[in-house]
Amino acid sequence: MFFGKIKKTAISIVLAIACVMVTCGITSDPAYAADMGAVYGIYEHGTGWSGYHGDKTAVRAGNGSYVTAIRASLLGQPDGMSGTLSYQVNLSGTGWLSWQENMTPNGSTETDMPLEAVRMAFTGQLAENYDVYYSVYQNGSWTTPVKNGETAGTEGQGLRVDGLWVTVTGKGAAVPEGPNERSVDPTRPMVALTFDDGPSKFTPRILD
């Protein structure tokens, strides 16, 4: 009898707490934030770090330069939602480096070796609620956006990464349109490359 009353009292307390949580809008899962986005930067050979660029910004190295490292994080991550935006790079001559996060540089700022490919992915609850899409500028154009750990770029083909584009969407949302800037201006004359001029050690494109 005594233990029965204790059991009923405990159940009543649990129900009361549940009612308060519902009434106050408190849940066990953090709220989804539609306006969360990526923020990122590139290390441009011969120049240094670019500024921080927001979600869906196409960031490219200057003419004749290329990317040797990247860094990235998030803006607007929901309070209480676990996880980070992680990123991995393939450094020419070295291969895939370890995953990094929270604006930790990944690549090299003390070498002339370019990046050849990039991977990005969410961890924790972020991975359950969001997709991260990304593209690199390589061989004269932007690659088709890939997501969640897939490889953007090439490996072992001698092609360098010249730019980076990143965007965040809700889990399972439609595939976003990639960078739409023109890679070639047909109104500008083409420059012939002679034997004396090059190519450079790391050509930005496949030469015919």
Model-derived features: positions:
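Lectin-type carbohydrate-recognition ectodomains
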Residues: A34-N180
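Active-site beta->alpha N-cap acidic-glycine motif
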Residues: E177-D208
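Hydrophobic alpha-helical membrane context
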Residues: C19-V20, D208
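Residues at the start of alpha-helices and the adjacent loop-to-helix junctions
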Residues: K8-A10, G25, P186
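N-terminal secretory signal peptides that target proteins for export/translocation
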Residues: M1-I6
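Sec-dependent N-terminal signal peptides
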Residues: K8-C19
